[in-house]
A protein has these predicted regions:
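Extended, folded cores of ATP/NTP-driven motor/assembly subunits in large transport
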Residues: 1-399
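Short glycine/proline-enriched loop/turn "hinge" motifs that connect secondary-structure elements
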Residues: 23-29, 102-107, 317-322, 414-416, ...
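P-loop NTPase motor domains
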Residues: 47, 51-63, 262-263, 355-356, ...
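Short, cationic low-complexity segments
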Residues: 132-161, 353, 445-450, 796-821
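Conserved P-loop NTPase motor cores
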Residues: 427-460, 469-481, 495-503, 635-755, ...
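Conserved SF1/SF2 helicase motif Ia
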Residues: 465-467
Length: 837
């Protein structure tokens, strides 16, 4: 079948000549330098930061010579999440997570910047002079080499200014990235196929009177090519009401509605044409005079003259730079009904910007052609409008969607806009970049905020990446996960200790496997004995601290020198009662400085025959060294003023011992509400020691709390825990909206972080079930992500009593197979007709 329409090859019409020294050279002798652009993430930029970004663009563009073109091109492509279910060693829950997000659609953003040097003649040409309209293109020769050299130098300055801004990163594209190479398409090929995949293929381009097609895709173009289409006032950003409150502000760039907020395949092209500023103003002066002389024939001429005068007055009085500008949104679809919907969506988003939506059907081919990377000088001059540089820059999209961390270690969280899974490193990468100085975390989330779900989700992924995890809990939050790990590892991991009267948790704080007592070990013993001896509100005297320190040091010297003495609390008590008493007598230490009888009397319950003699004299050492997932459940003693703090300290001390022996392996201790047991003045130094030691031995200390009052009323929490936790994690705080000022001050949060926290769960997608979480790293990097999990993970993590009862009852029916019970229960919820048995 013959094609009866006029046809030509892309080769005949192709406007580009070559790529030399990383620059695209057009057949009309225009030079273009191409960059890949990294923008800040969505919802993470404040008004002041948007103004700083605007200022950086302004300074950078000012260094470019006359008759340069700045073309920013933002591709937004709908893609589907591809799960990594074939990965070796993937656990049951990880596989469930990946399957849950299988083919989840999301909008991916690719941003490019093209800086072009053209000539005065080319910059004035209209659409009928486009290379698309010429029968044959004869390559032109670059006659002025010095102009090219100066332009390349200016581009280098432009790049430095933008990269030094701290917000936007430019990376110059290489020749293979522009033209492509074996198996990888370049940006030009990708543009012609409306794709960003490396394996894209070229498609036929159809130019018809009523539409333009690329392959099966129909193009839909909206333009901002007249100053009448713009609102009366432009700004760098606007308030995003969906995520703002009367106490917080969420900001987006002015053009964000046609960026990541427009959920269809589209390209947003932003052009700024830098002509000769002085000549522009001179031409306007001449036009104003002409309008004045013709004003008697039409009032419109007088009005236009006044507008031009105002433009000139602004330019001269404020030193503003006169430029031309054009923006367009080019969307596409292979479905005509879809194109109608897209046309309405684009029009609505432009209306949100208070712009007049102008659906352009006439200039689609020439504007598409001018959008080819390197062919910016082919832009039809009649499609641009005069404005000032500052106003033109307000039409730039200044944010992108969330990105994954470039790190082998991390946790999977979901993008709060699209729900796409992201790999987020909140431990190692921030330390490498100098954003944080430790890996410790402080988690604050009220009851019902999804705190337990998040911590379960986090520690599971840490465990699966080789970390040793020790949890101190007071609410059975980790029972399901621990049991699942226990069954899967045949009892090697997932060890669950519960404190009962029949089987209490007992330790020996004086036992050291290698016989070496370092400073941290001595400090933990002193803190433990101080906790037994003094009440929380009773501070020891300096003389008492010295006496206790000397007693511990002397006892350690005894047991390391005399192997016949069994290290335990009983022998320590006897040593103080007999040997140390004689030492004090020889030194003439007075009773008011250290009351040894009072000391022994208070500690007697922990000595042989006392009420708690089992607690510190264990002859069985818990094997915490080789078990990678351990939970201590202290719910039964959380209200016991003696047992709770002592048991918590001993667990922490045992964790420190574990850390010393496991070199080069990540260790994590997570303390839920049990931190309250150690938040006393006497323990402040010990907690600081713990945090210092954790950092030294590749560890992470994580404290979790739900009561705001607890952290507000405790100076120990601020000084010892919060100040030593560079990662702050907060969940929904809306119930504490009226108290948030004190929380903000306590945690040292910025106003930007406050706005992000108060936006949590404000505009959740109705079709997805998730809770949002805020992360702050070192007070300089922060974002909100979503904890969205599969049904299998949901039933493993749930703390809802009825759901836990249902799950464990089903597991009992299945012979204790919790994994199978989770699978059956999840499947029955997905397909209500199925039975769990």
């Amino acid at each position: 079948m013959r094609n009866t329409l006029k046809a030509t090859t892309l080769e005949r019409k192709f406007p580009l000549l070559a790529v030399e020294n990383g620059c695209i050279v057009s057949k009309d002798a225009d030079i273009t330098v191409a960059f890949r652009v990294e923008l800040p993430e969505l919802f993470t930029v404040t008004r002041a930061e948007y103004e700083a970004i605007h200022s950086a663009w302004y300074k950078a563009i000012k260094v470019l010579p006359g008759y340069s073109i700045v073309h920013k091109q933002d591709f937004f492509i709908t893609e589907n999440y591809q799960p990594d279910t074939e990965k070796d060693g993937l656990s049951f829950l990880s596989r469930s997570y990946e399957r849950h997000f299988n083919e989840r659609p999301f909008l991916n953003h690719y941003c490019y910047l093209f800086l072009t040097k053209t000539t005065k003649e080319r910059s004035r040409r209209q659409s009928d002079f486009s290379t698309l309209c010429r029968g044959r293109i004869v390559p032109q020769e670059i006659t002025d080499k010095e102009t090219v050299t100066k332009f390349v130098e200016a581009v280098g300055q432009f790049e430095r200014i933008m990269n030094d801004s701290g917000f936007i990163t430019l990376a110059r594209l290489t020749a293979p990235e522009i033209t492509g190479e074996d198996g990888r398409a370049g940006i030009i090929e990708k543009y012609f196929s409306l794709s960003q995949t490396d394996t894209t293929s070229l498609k036929d381009i159809g130019l018809y009177p009523e539409e333009m097609r690329i392959g099966d895709d129909i193009l839909c173009l909206h333009t901002l090519s007249d100053v009448e289409d713009l609102p009366g006032k432009l700004g760098t950003d606007f308030r995003f009401e969906k995520l703002s409150t009367d106490r917080s502000d969420c900001r987006l760039s002015f053009a964000a509605p046609v960026g990541v907020l427009l959920s269809c395949n589209h390209v947003y092209n932003q052009y700024i044409f830098i002509d000769d500023h002085a000549e522009n103003l001179k031409n306007f002066e001449q036009t104003a005079r002409n309008m004045q002389s013709l004003s008697r024939y039409s009032r419109a001429n007088q009005v236009n003259k006044e507008w031009i005068d105002e433009y000139l007055n602004e330019a001269h009085s404020k030193g503003l730079i006169s430029v031309r500008c054009h923006c367009n949104v080019m969307a596409w679809s292979d479905d005509r009904e879809e194109i109608k919907r897209i046309r309405n969506d684009v029009g609505s988003q432009l209306a949100l910007m208070e712009c007049k939506p102008r659906h352009n059907t006439v200039d689609v081919p020439t504007l598409f052609w001018a959008g080819i990377p390197g062919n910016e000088a082919d832009f039809p001059a009649e499609e641009s409008f005069y404005t000032f540089l500052g106003q033109a820059l307000c039409l730039f999209v200044e944010e992108t969607n969330y990105k994954s961390s470039l790190s082998p270690f991390g946790i999977k969280m979901a993008d709060r806009v699209s729900g796409r899974p992201l790999h987020i490193d909140i431990s190692d990468l921030p330390m490498k970049k100098g954003i944080t100085t430790n890996r410790n975390k402080f988690i604050l989330g009220p009851s019902g905020s999804g705190k337990s779900f998040f911590t379960n989700h986090m520690v599971r992924q840490y465990y699966e990446q080789g970390a040793h995890v020790l949890l101190v809990d007071t609410g059975n939050s980790y029972l399901g996960l621990s049991q699942l790990i226990h069954n899967r590892t045949h009892g090697e991991d997932g060890i669950y200790f519960t404190y009962t009267n029949e089987n209490p948790i007992a330790f020996n704080p004086f036992y050291v496997e290698d016989g070496v007592f370092d400073i941290e070990k001595k400090e933990s013993i002193k803190t433990l004995i101080l906790t037994l001896w003094k009440r929380d509100d009773e501070a020891p005297k300096r003389s008492e601290e010295v006496a206790l320190s000397n007693a511990v040091s002397a006892y350690i010297e005894r047991i390391t020198g005399d192997k016949s003495v069994t290290p335990c609390f009983n022998t320590f008590y006897e040593f103080v009662r007999d040997d140390y008493r004689r030492q004090l007598e020889r030194k003439n230490v007075r009773e008011k400085d250290f009351d040894i009888d009072g000391f022994l009397n208070v500690l007697e319950p922990y000595y042989r025959g006392g009420e708690y003699d089992y607690l510190l004299n264990s002859d069985k050492e818990l094997d915490l060294l080789h078990k990678r997932f351990i939970v201590f459940e202290l719910d039964n003693i959380k209200d016991h003023k003696i047992l709770f703090p002592i048991t918590t300290i001993i667990i922490m001390e045992a964790f420190i011992n574990k850390m010393r022996k496991l070199k080069g392996i990540r260790k994590l201790i997570l303390i839920e509400e049990a931190w309250k047991a150690i938040a006393s003045a006497n323990m402040a130094d010990y907690i600081k020691y713990l945090y210092k030691t954790v950092r030294k031995y590749f560890g992470e200390a994580i404290v979790v709390t739900q009561e705001v009052e607890d952290i507000i009323s405790s100076p120990i929490v601020k000084e010892s825990i919060i100040n030593n936790s560079d990662c702050k994690i907060l969940l929904d705080q809306r119930k504490y909206l009226n108290k948030f000022d004190s929380i903000q001050n306590l945690l040292g949060l910025t106003d930007k972080e406050r706005s992000q926290i108060l936006s949590i769960n404000m505009a959740n997608h109705p079709g997805r079930k998730y809770k949002e979480v805020f992360f702050s790293l070192g007070g300089t990097q922060s974002a909100v992500y979503a904890t969205e999990v599969s049904l299998e993970e949901y039933y493993t993590y749930t703390t809802e009593e009825s759901e836990k009862t249902e799950l464990f009852a089903l597991a009992d029916k299945l012979g204790g197979n919790l994994e199978l019970a989770v699978k059956r229960l999840a499947e029955s919820k997905r397909n209500p007709g199925l039975s769990t048995t």
